[in-house]
């Protein structure tokens, strides 16, 4: 059984993002109150706030953890047009004795001229790299050449998406058969027919990111996007949060069938589409094996989705924040108590905000 445990977050405004660290024992939250809070899970399973500080001069849209191989490192992004990198300092201070940790700003990334709407660390096999996207339609990729010096970041790539960007997701695959890839979503609500999801792939020859050829047909505003962890699959799975939940597969077309040196072509199939939230969906998040997807919407529920042996996706659980039973929980499958073990592994946020992201 899932047990709902309420946490008095003590944020003074809307919470926009919740992010778990790699091990699922630390959590970061960010809010329109311009602060980030870090929470640690005790042996008894309770969450305690061990750090809280003002991070930006505007609403903080997203917060994300680096892989622990690089230390205890966070990145945040804000309406104030910046992204920031933070590192936890472990010392002999009295703070630690009082159960408090100390976080130091290592760098501020100031290249964007508009609201920075998402920030994500690259998969660890790529080194310490960070991607941001902003309301002006530009994805920027930074690298820390010396992982021991987080105050130095160099801008490696700027990718123009032609549409206001709302969210990004790195493809986590570490297979040499797959080039680094990043998916970008747009919440542009103008009625133009441009696809709201774009895929960019790194080209070893040009050393640049190029738009992959995809027939991605999403035209509704996209609030969140997430590649599934890839455990040996030859294709990729991408989840999208828009007015509903959508799951796509991306299968690379064989190299000999594509033009030499040209952009990779992908065969795109929509394998699931669910409007069970009956509202805007704000976050999608995979478990660590890429087999269970969690989505959260304006209906106040987190819904869990899983494919059966026939590759048919079904709802396998519905969670409501206050722990009350959910009407219509029999929709699209039944609750499955065995999924309880997936919760610590649900990487990144499950709590979206219906406030949207204001563009400067």
From Swiss-Prot:
Main location: nucleus
GO biological process: attachment of mitotic spindle microtubules to kinetochore; cell division; cellular response to amino acid starvation; cellular response to nutrient levels; defense response to Gram-positive bacterium; mitotic metaphase chromosome alignment; mRNA transport; negative regulation of TORC1 signaling
Pfam family, one: WD40
UniProt-annotated stretches for the region Disordered: 324-360
Gene3D superfamilies assigned: YVTN repeat-like/Quinoprotein amine dehydrogenase
Source organism, top-level taxon: Eukaryota
MF (Gene Ontology): structural molecule activity
InterPro entries: G-protein_beta_WD-40_rep, Sec13/Seh1_fam, WD40/YVTN_repeat-like_dom_sf, WD40_repeat_dom_sf, WD40_rpt
Cross-link (Glycyl lysine isopeptide (Lys-Gly) (interchain with G-Cter in SUMO2)): 12
Keywords annotated in UniProt: Cell cycle, Cell division, Centromere, Chromosome, Chromosome partition, Isopeptide bond, Kinetochore, Lysosome, Membrane, Mitosis, mRNA transport, Nuclear pore complex, Nucleus, Phosphoprotein, Protein transport, Repeat, Translocation, Transport, Ubl conjugation, WD repeat
Compartment(s) where it occurs, according to its Swiss-Prot or TrEMBL record: Chromosome, Centromere, Kinetochore; Nucleus, Nuclear pore complex; Lysosome membrane
Modified residues (Phosphoserine): 179, 190
GO cellular component assignments: cytosol; GATOR2 complex; kinetochore; lysosomal membrane; nuclear envelope; nuclear pore; nuclear pore outer ring; Seh1-associated complex
Activity regulation text: The GATOR2 complex is negatively regulated by the upstream amino acid sensors CASTOR1 and SESN2, which sequester the GATOR2 complex in absence of amino acids. In the presence of abundant amino acids, GATOR2 is released from CASTOR1 and SESN2 and activated.
Comp. bias (Polar residues): 324-354
WD repeat placement: 10-49, 55-96, 111-152, 160-210, 217-258, 276-315
Stated family: Belongs to the WD repeat SEC13 family.
Task performed by this protein: Component of the Nup107-160 subcomplex of the nuclear pore complex (NPC). The Nup107-160 subcomplex is required for the assembly of a functional NPC. The Nup107-160 subcomplex is also required for normal kinetochore microtubule attachment, mitotic progression and chromosome segregation. This subunit plays a role in recruitment of the Nup107-160 subcomplex to the kinetochore. As a component of the GATOR2 complex, functions as an activator of the amino acid-sensing branch of the mTORC1 signaling pathway. The GATOR2 complex indirectly activates mTORC1 through the inhibition of the GATOR1 subcomplex. GATOR2 probably acts as an E3 ubiquitin-protein ligase toward GATOR1. In the presence of abundant amino acids, the GATOR2 complex mediates ubiquitination of the NPRL2 core component of the GATOR1 complex, leading to GATOR1 inactivation. In the absence of amino acids, GATOR2 is inhibited, activating the GATOR1 complex.
Assembly: Component of the Nup107-160 subcomplex of the nuclear pore complex (NPC). The Nup107-160 subcomplex includes NUP160, NUP133, NUP107, NUP98, NUP85, NUP43, NUP37, SEH1 and SEC13. The SEH1 subunit appears to be only weakly associated with the Nup107-160 subcomplex. Component of the GATOR2 subcomplex, composed of MIOS, SEC13, SEH1L, WDR24 and WDR59. The GATOR2 complex interacts with CASTOR1 and CASTOR2; the interaction is negatively regulated by arginine. The GATOR2 complex interacts with SESN1, SESN2 and SESN3; the interaction is negatively regulated by amino acids.
Listed name of the protein: Nucleoporin SEH1
